[in-house]
Amino acid sequence: MESFNVVETLQPAERALFWVGALITASLALYVVYKTITGFRIWVLGNGDLLSPKLGKWAVVTGATDGIGKSYAEELARRGFSMMLISRSQEKLDDVAKSLESTYKVETKTIAVDFSQIDVYPKIEKGLAGLEIGILVNNVGISYSYPEFFLHIPDLENFITTMINVNITSVCQMTRLVLPRMEARAKGVILNISSASGMFPVPLLTIYSSTKAFVDFFSRGLQTEYKCKGIIIQSVLPFFVATKMTKIRKPTLDKPTPERYVAAELNTVGLQDQTNGYFPHAVMGWVTTILAPIDLVLNLGLRMNKAQRGGYLRRRKLR
């Protein structure tokens, strides 16, 4: 009995379509398998002991006294790094430094500066002199007090300057100070904390969103420049984390504590040049940038932020 071959019964045009469909199906299947394996490596296996003082004795964290920055300092100290903490309040810096020394038995140093001022970098450069820096976490950043239309932002001229100095200039200048010695030793890690707000425009948070898009592009460009020299530069784009800045008090699965977020994010270093840092955030990033049309994302953002703006102004009777 002769075997029946479906392909041979098709007309030439139908046969071509059949093979195109088969090729597309096979490609999609391979893509799913690849992404599954890659995801397992990133979110389950992690990067092992990549982040250790073998990179360099010291880790530097800006904005190190609260939220995500403080959690980076704690986690890196737990891994054995001596910590250089840079933030505005010397009192808060001293409190965090004492806690790290007591809990993790590591050496600490502090530099108190206001990153909204552009004349602070000679002081920072002097404080960093002679340190073997393995990791730099560019975390310091500011956002809006509440969502607002561009022309209605109080003290707009100063707001623009301050936002750029803290969110953009600090990243560039700190990288300028630290990267040369990393390049000379052919190893080092720079983590630039951007935001999911930098993945797409966010109406009523437009300046903040734009500064975070800069941080993302800056990080990815530098990684391409310096990856071949043994240096890792990663763009980190978290969604909401339960911190003072976000005003989220109760953590949830999609709004984790900073400790939980940082522990997850550090496992992605060396595996992703651009990361949302935390699996639920990675899913949210895929939905907002790949699945959902950008116009829908923009309109939803506008509606949500207008509602938050209205609530803020009503509470303060400013509307």
UniProtKB/Swiss-Prot annotation:
It is found in: Endoplasmic reticulum membrane. GO terms for biological process: estrogen biosynthetic process; fatty acid biosynthetic process. Pathway: Lipid metabolism; fatty acid biosynthesis; Steroid biosynthesis; estrogen biosynthesis. Substrate binds at S195. It catalyses: a very-long-chain (3R)-3-hydroxyacyl-CoA + NADP(+) = a very-long-chain 3-oxoacyl-CoA + NADPH + H(+); 17beta-estradiol + NAD(+) = estrone + NADH + H(+); 17beta-estradiol + NADP(+) = estrone + NADPH + H(+). InterPro entries: NAD(P)-bd_dom_sf (IPR036291), Sc_DH/Rdtase_CS (IPR020904), SDR_fam (IPR002347), VLCFA-Steroid_DH (IPR051019). It comes from the Eukaryota. NADP(+) binds at residues 56-85. GO terms for molecular function: estradiol 17-beta-dehydrogenase [NAD(P)+] activity; oxidoreductase activity; very-long-chain 3-oxoacyl-CoA reductase activity. Its EC number is 1.1.1.330, 1.1.1.62. CDD domains: 17beta-HSD1_like_SDR_c. It holds the Pfam family adh_short. GO terms for cellular component: endoplasmic reticulum; endoplasmic reticulum membrane. The active site is at Y208 (proton acceptor). It is a multi-pass membrane protein. The chain crosses the membrane at residues 17-37, 188-208, 282-302. Gene3D superfamilies: NAD(P)-binding Rossmann-like Domain. Keywords: Endoplasmic reticulum, Lipid biosynthesis, Lipid metabolism, Membrane, NADP, Oxidoreductase, Steroid biosynthesis, Transmembrane, Transmembrane helix. PANTHER family: RH59310P, VERY-LONG-CHAIN 3-OXOACYL-COA REDUCTASE. Catalyzes the second of the four reactions of the long-chain fatty acids elongation cycle. This endoplasmic reticulum-bound enzymatic process, allows the addition of two carbons to the chain of long- and very long-chain fatty acids/VLCFAs per cycle. This enzyme has a 3-ketoacyl-CoA reductase activity, reducing 3-ketoacyl-CoA to 3-hydroxyacyl-CoA, within each cycle of fatty acid elongation. Thereby, it may participate in the production of VLCFAs of different chain lengths that are involved in multiple biological processes as precursors of membrane lipids and lipid mediators. Belongs to the short-chain dehydrogenases/reductases (SDR) family. 17-beta-HSD 3 subfamily. This is Very-long-chain 3-oxoacyl-CoA reductase-A. It comes from Danio rerio.
